[in-house]
């Protein structure tokens, strides 16, 4: 399948069910790709889900169904508010390799520029070479590692930090 017929939009609290659906799908389908666990999110109240939409969340919809997600978490400190972290990155398996991830990242980047973000950052598992290569193709560079940054099933996995300048 290609990414044609997919609509990407910044969602609001009125679309909390779509957010919940795609986020839980992501955590269930790709548990090693996220620092969070399915069980941590499954128990959230509806209000907690709504509260998480205080930060920008973009969802890709195909025929009204959520098929991808990316979020943006802006730094709070006034001296760091020009930076934001890309979070919750997930594309349904059948749509990977179609350009949908690029389109979601473009939507996030455009929104970030519009709200004064100058640098995007993200963390990715050192074991996820496919994601690392994708981010490199999109202009991200590794800027550091946290040895054993993620503990999964008793195993310590390095967390790779990457960044991309949006301006300057």
Give residue ranges: language-model regions:
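Extreme N-terminal starter segment of soluble prokaryotic enzymes
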Residues: 5-7
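Flexible nucleotide-binding loop
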Residues: 98
């Amino acid at each position: 399948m290609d990414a044609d017929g997919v609509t990407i939009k910044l969602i609001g609290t009125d679309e909390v069910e779509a957010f919940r659906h795609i986020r839980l799908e992501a955590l269930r389908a790709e548990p090693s790709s996220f620092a969070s666990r399915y069980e941590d999110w499954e128990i959230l109240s509806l209000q907690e889900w709504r509260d998480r939409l205080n930060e920008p969340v973009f969802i890709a919809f195909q025929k009204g169904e959520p098929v991808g997600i990316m979020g943006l978490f802006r730094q709070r400190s006034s001296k760091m508010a020009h930076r934001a972290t890309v979070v919750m990155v997930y594309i349904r398996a059948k749509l990977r390799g179609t350009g949908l991830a690029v389109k979601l990242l473009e939507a996030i980047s455009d929104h970030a520029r519009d709200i004064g973000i100058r640098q995007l950052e993200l963390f990715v598992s050192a074991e996820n070479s496919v994601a690392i290569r994708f981010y490199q193709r999109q202009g991200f560079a590794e800027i550091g590692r946290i040895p054993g940054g993620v503990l999964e099933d008793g195993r310590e996995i390095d967390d790779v930090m990457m960044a991309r300048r949006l301006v300057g």
